[in-house]
């Protein structure tokens, strides 16, 4: 029994590729289709109506910038215990500063 191809390949002769393009319209621009004129345009919606967006009046002003270089090291601390100011002694007897 011969296997038949059910779907036609785009490279096959006589097959045209269809592109579905969604036209976006600007605020105040009337759509070409009559039935689409009753639908509201997204451009008409005020920006403040979006719930996730923070209004500029409520946002804290960014007047101060964080320092470029922080004295703290980033990442996890080496140990959770409190570090002493005393120098830490290694087994070899070499003194390293505990910072």
Curated annotation (Swiss-Prot):
Residues 1-24, 49-99 are annotated as: Disordered. Residues 15-24, 71-81 have a biased composition (Basic residues). This is Uncharacterized 11.4 kDa protein.
């Amino acid at each position: 029994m011969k296997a038949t191809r059910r779907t036609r390949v785009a490279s096959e002769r006589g097959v045209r590729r269809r592109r579905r393009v969604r036209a976006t319209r600007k605020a105040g621009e009337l759509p070409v289709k009559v039935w689409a004129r009753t639908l509201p345009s997204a451009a008409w919606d005020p920006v403040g109506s979006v719930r996730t967006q923070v209004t500029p009046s409520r946002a804290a002003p960014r007047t101060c910038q964080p320092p470029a270089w922080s004295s703290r090291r980033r990442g996890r601390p080496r140990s959770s215990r409190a570090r002493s100011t005393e120098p830490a002694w290694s087994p070899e007897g070499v003194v390293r500063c505990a910072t």
